[in-house]
Amino acid sequence: MHVPIRLLEWFKVEQTLVIQKKKRFGFSQGIGITLLIAIVAKYLAELPFLNIMGQLVIAILIGMVWRAAIGVPHDAIAGTNFASKKLLRFGIILLGMRLNLVDIAKAGPKVLVIAAVVITFTIFVVYGLTKVFKVEKKLGILTACGTAICGAAAVVAIAPQVKAKDDETAVGAAIIAILGTIFTLIYTLLYPVLGLSPYGYGVFSGATLHEIAHVIAAAAPGGSAAVDIAVIVKLTRVAMLVPVAILIGLWFGKSEGSKEKRSWRDLPIPWFIFGFLAMSAVHSLGIIPEVVAGYIVVIAYMLIAMAMAGLGLNVEFKTFRKLGSKAFVAGLIGSVCLSVLGYVLVYALGFM
């Protein structure tokens, strides 16, 4: 009797080991797919037209195409989910190395004013429009914040605050990416007739466009003077992601009517955002050489691109059509309003 029992125990152990090995392989496969997509997206983003879209946008689109054309193995989903959540947060922390708080301070209070005004205005207008078009609440918030602050990075940073699903996050990021690309092309065509100096045009681009890649591409016709100030204005908007994320979390929790008692640990504070600020402070103090900081930013974008790929791999095109059409229209109208406001503020604040 002892032999069969031992054989049964051995069989169970072997079966457990096989299952664990299969899970580890599936996890590694999921991570590998997102890494491959992120690398391909990086090189595609260096091509003449695709550089307008940027690595993050291309990664999420490739992910969606991959799912539609090839599919994602069931065991690999754990890896793609890990990339879209855990690696995302680590990437956002490292992205803080892109931000130099000293440069923002040198730009003066008017830059802070224009950033604060456009963010506040855009969140209210775009979210209001999504309600008019009967867009799902969480997707409406993500669309509003992505338009107002910093595109896909804002969408994925705000998503945990409103408990958004992966498909809502992916659709929100894709909408903002497409809108930003459209408006980048429009800005480039309109630059000669806007009547703005290179400096003023840079402020206008940085204050109103969605992604950093969009801002750099749109400001390029104005030369280095336009690009430099455009990036500073844009990064000022990025810096406001922290307070906006906290406020959105508090508002969403209250609007959902949660009456449970919460400790300070339960406050809707995206703790990884403080890592982002800490990295910004390190960069601002000049502790890390610029060359090293540049490499860290490249790694940050690679990690976030892997997260974008993971999101894309979790959403189908039919889901995008179902959830995204009305949100896209709301974002489009809101982006037009944002552009008009930005243009007016450039003149009103004397940035011409």
UniProtKB/Swiss-Prot annotation:
Predominant location: membrane
Pfam families referenced in this protein's UniProt entry, alphabetically: Cons_hypoth698
Family to which the UniProt record says this protein belongs: Belongs to the UPF0324 family.
TM annotation in the entry: 25-47, 52-71, 111-130, 140-162, 169-191, 201-223, 230-252, 267-289, 291-313, 328-350
Membrane topology: Multi-pass membrane protein
InterPro entries for this protein: UPF0324_pro (IPR018383)
Native source species: Bacillus cereus (strain ATCC 10987 / NRS 248)
Annotated compartments: Cell membrane
One Gene Ontology CC term in the entry: plasma membrane
Listed name of the protein: UPF0324 membrane protein BCE_5279
Alphabetical UniProt keywords: Cell membrane, Membrane, Transmembrane, Transmembrane helix
